[in-house]
From Swiss-Prot:
<dbReference type="GO" id="GO:0015451">
    <property type="term" value="F:decarboxylation-driven active transmembrane transporter activity"/>
</dbReference>
<keyword id="KW-0739">Sodium transport</keyword>
<comment type="similarity">
    <text>Belongs to the GcdB/MmdB/OadB family.</text>
</comment>
<feature type="transmembrane region" description="Helical">
    <location>
        <begin position="339"/>
        <end position="361"/>
    </location>
</feature>
<dbReference type="GO" id="GO:0016829">
    <property type="term" value="F:lyase activity"/>
</dbReference>
<feature type="transmembrane region" description="Helical">
    <location>
        <begin position="308"/>
        <end position="327"/>
    </location>
</feature>
<feature type="transmembrane region" description="Helical">
    <location>
        <begin position="266"/>
        <end position="286"/>
    </location>
</feature>
<feature type="transmembrane region" description="Helical">
    <location>
        <begin position="159"/>
        <end position="178"/>
    </location>
</feature>
<feature type="transmembrane region" description="Helical">
    <location>
        <begin position="409"/>
        <end position="431"/>
    </location>
</feature>
<keyword id="KW-0472">Membrane</keyword>
<keyword id="KW-0813">Transport</keyword>
<keyword id="KW-1133">Transmembrane helix</keyword>
<feature type="transmembrane region" description="Helical">
    <location>
        <begin position="180"/>
        <end position="202"/>
    </location>
</feature>
<keyword id="KW-0812">Transmembrane</keyword>
<protein>
    <recommendedName>
        <fullName>Oxaloacetate decarboxylase beta chain</fullName>
        <ecNumber>7.2.4.2</ecNumber>
    </recommendedName>
</protein>
<comment type="function">
    <text>Catalyzes the decarboxylation of oxaloacetate coupled to Na(+) translocation.</text>
</comment>
<comment type="subunit">
    <text>Heterotrimer of an alpha, a beta and a gamma subunit.</text>
</comment>
Length: 433
């Protein structure tokens, strides 16, 4: 009878908390969105499955060695950790002390937990290697660079301004997060506000990279918000685009793009990297990988490498990136008031970025002889190529013969560059404070 009772008590179901149950449902929702609705399935499917694995009771797949020790709640072991941190031998007190401790001290406590016989779960290891090191988003950016054609941007350099204007959503959201904190509605630190703001760039890898550096505790919510809203671009953007433009403006036909030479395409990534990195070194990792991937594509001499980066490598890294993000979908980190704030601020960021791009195009038309269709301004958010397709679709609704796709790809690509630069600005000034 005792053995039967022990068997029942050992069932994971007996240890399932309300928070874990909610997160399992959230993870199933992400899987449904990925499979049934095809919302960014390449990321939401592994993120959702990672969330399932992270919330299995007693499995500890997303826990570090130290977190496993704290979950085990052995009084003698807690006393050893507490003595090192000079706090009470209580789980909550130890967690509070760890939150304030230097990274070196946190590393020492992790090593101490390993010495006591604990080990990190597989998802925690994935997270440390893929996101903790920053390597996975950078490799993704290399792949994106290899798939990007700078031709439309080089053919119409003015569209760079549209990509820059759309980044206003990032900085507006940072101010929004700090405003919520100022009025005591939801608590956000400056690094957290900066990490949330990058959602407005509509660039998943950049959002994950910056969150991993500035606010890893919010990474799960930020990544889910970023990719969910990227999938919802066809629903979010058109009402804003139509509200800010007249029917006449939506029918503007732009001049045919010129042919961009091979030399221009080869020189551009190198020149872009040097110009930006010499002024803003913190943007060099993201922009460097992006430009390197593009140079492999345009040079024409490393087709095997370019093909590998565009396909096999980016697909492999995407799997581990998604599972690593899923490791952060644990109840005690995701089910917080901050998550609601992130979801609200995220959609505001998209709306502000879209509006800023459209309004910049209208402003440019005041001073320009060759008119720009304001609809392509919304493509300044770097959801490539979805935002450009939305611009083209809304344009065709106004004029069935007005094809804007290639024109919209200019600001769309510029948005990728802009989000990387914005991330560099955040890193430089937030980490320096």
């Amino acid at each position: 009878m005792e053995s039967l009772n022990a068997l029942i008590q050992g069932l994971g179901l007996m240890h399932l908390g309300a928070g874990q149950a909610i997160m399992l449902l959230v993870s199933l929702l992400l899987l449904w969105l990925a499979i049934a609705k095809k919302f960014e399935p390449l990321l939401l499917l592994p993120i959702g499955f990672g969330g399932l694995l992270s919330n299995i009771p007693e499995a500890g797949l997303a826990l570090t060695a130290l977190e496993s020790l704290l979950a085990h709640r052995d009084p003698a072991q807690l006393a050893v950790i507490a003595a090192k941190l000079h706090c009470a031998p209580d789980v909550h007190a130890i967690k509070a002390a760890l939150a304030l401790a230097l990274p070196s001290v946190q590393g020492q406590m992790e090593s101490l937990a390993v010495d006591m016989g604990y080990s990190a779960g597989v998802l925690a290891i994935f997270y440390k290697v893929a996101i903790g090191s920053g390597i996975a988003p950078l490799v993704i950016f290399m792949g994106v660079g290899a798939m990007t054609d700078f031709g439309p941007l080089l053919a119409n350099p003015r569209t760079l301004l549209l990509g820059a204007a759309a980044q206003f959503g990032i900085f507006a959201t940072v101010l929004g997060a700090l405003t919520l904190n100022y009025f005591g509605i939801i608590s956000f630190t400056l690094p957290q506000a900066a990490a949330i703001g990058i959602i407005g760039g509509a660039d998943g890898p950049t959002a994950i990279y910056l969150s991993g550096k500035l606010a890893p505790e919010l990474l799960g919510a930020i990544a889910v918000a970023a990719y969910s809203y990227m999938a919802l671009v066809p629903l979010i953007q058109p009402p804003i685009m139509k509200a800010l433009t007249t029917d006449k403006e939506r029918k503007i036909r732009m001049v045919q793009l010129r042919t961009v030479s091979k030399r221009e395409k080869i020189l551009f990534p190198a020149v872009l990297l040097l110009l930006v990195a010499l002024l803003l070194p913190d943007a060099a990792p993201l922009l460097g990988m992006f430009c390197f991937g593009n140079l492999m594509r345009e040079s024409g001499v490393v087709e095997r490498l370019s093909d590998t980066v565009q396909n096999a490598l980016i697909n492999i890294v995407t799997i581990f990136l998604g599972l690593s993000v899923g490791a952060k979908l644990v109840a005690d980190k995701f089910l917080q008031p901050q998550t609601l704030g992130i979801l609200v601020l995220g959609v505001i960021a998209f709306c502000v970025g879209t509006a800023a791009g459209v309004l910049m195009a209208k402003l440019m038309n005041v001073f320009s002889r060759h008119k720009i269709n304001p609809l392509i301004g919304s493509a300044g958010v770097s959801a490539v190529p979805m935002a450009a397709r939305v611009s083209n679709k809304v344009g065709l609704e106004a004029d069935g013969q007005n094809f804007l796709l290639m024109h919209a790809m200019g600001p769309n690509v510029a948005g990728v560059i802009g989000s990387a630069i914005a991330a560099g600005v955040m890193l430089k000034y937030v980490l320096a404070m």
